[in-house]
Amino acid sequence: MRAELNNGLIDFLKASPTPFHATATLVQHFEAAGFQRLDERDTWAIETGGRYFVTRNDSSIVAFRMGRQSPLTGGIRMVGAHTDSPCLRVKPQPELQRQGFWQLGVEVYGGALLAPWFDRDLSLAGRVTFRRDGKVESQLIDFKLPIAVIPNLAIHLNRTANEGWAINAQNELPPILAQVAGDERADFRALLTDQLAREHGLNADVVLDYELSFYDTQSAAVVGLNGDFLAGARLDNLLSCYAGMQALLNSESDETALLVCTDHEEVGSSSTCGADGAMLEQIVQRLLPSSEDYVRTIQKSLLISADNAHGIHPNYAEKHDANHGPKLNAGPVIKVNSNQRYATNSETAGFFRHLCMAEEVPVQSFVVRSDMACGSTIGPITASHLGIRTVDIGLPTFAMHSIRELAGSHDLAHLVKVLSAFYASHELP
């Protein structure tokens, strides 16, 4: 099971270079399992035992399985994750021609660790909006090939490079795509038009706009002398999206189960398709006949917010509280913060720990050092919007927000096992 899950995750990561592609890949899995697509603009006819999914902005998805008994009776078991990861996004007018090279101006999306982006074989993917035959259409594209690179400055010209230096995102991050000769002018939109034709056979009249990100073409892999680790891009947080999907597809229960994977977590979640928007609340409201039933159901429900946790690094152990250093391959981590940066409380943490014990899954705890600021997740946001009890958990990870992160190769199976047990559980606290 472990090898099968890890290989499946590697394939999932390869197919999901952007939130748009991640959502499309999730859709493929759910449709293959018989889930029915719902359109928010239509009237819904939800059936007992039915399986459905809804997407918004092509970058967020809510998938759910209606239980054989009403959610008003047993509540809803929810797992939440996010589809986005820190990256470099192409600007609207990105063309740069400097010293005979064609480069693209980029914005830093989220809290990216920038140094690892240098000297990597980069490709480009995302969503393009264009006009064709008088109509506005959108399509996902993925160049797949390594078409760009951000070369480092040689140490001979930067003698203090190994002493640390501040990276200037405006000047130092534009990737190089090609050399240009003489008066030749680079045309990025023409490149996108060609890609639409090459990848999809679409003859666009004009490219109107786009949301495109660079990504590392190196595939994720199981690494280490004994295969102990899983290395790859976007483990934060596509690892949790994949685990939640596997758990939802492979668990059976009389209760209603739901997976929500939203966009824009890395930049605050404030969007129509982010956790700070109304998407999840609006969808859950449509599953229940009245506002009173909605409130009653939410109070019987529970959310597991799944997002990667900081594993204790052997070279930087002092960055962790000595008693709360999660180890790779030692199971999922319960995240706790008294200032509500995580939504965990003693009741929800206790229930998650109970699930882990029942499934013989190891479990750990994380609290940030008292002299360091704590990050956050969709957990507190969703708990606030819905009023739902929540526990924040995640798998230990090194190099979070790097272009290539590292997790334990045993932990994905641990997480899928406990999330499956959660979806199948007959009683909530």
Curated annotation (Swiss-Prot):
Molecular function terms from GO: aminopeptidase activity; metallopeptidase activity; zinc ion binding
NCBIfam families named among the record's database cross-references: PRK02813.1 (NF002759)
Binding site for Zn(2+): H82, H156, H401
Cofactor: Zn(2+)
EC number: 3.4.11.-
Protein keywords: Aminopeptidase, Hydrolase, Metal-binding, Metalloprotease, Protease, Zinc
SUPFAM superfamilies xref list: Aminopeptidase/glucanase lid domain, Zn-dependent exopeptidases
Official protein name in the record: Probable M18 family aminopeptidase 2
This protein's GO CC annotations: cytoplasm
Record carries keyword Transmembrane: no
GO term, biological process aspect, one: proteolysis
Protein family: Belongs to the peptidase M18 family.
InterPro entries registered for this protein in UniProt: M18_aminopeptidase_2, Peptidase_M18, Peptidase_M18_dom2
Database matches in PANTHER family: ASPARTYL AMINOPEPTIDASE
Pfam families with a match to the protein in the record: Peptidase_M18
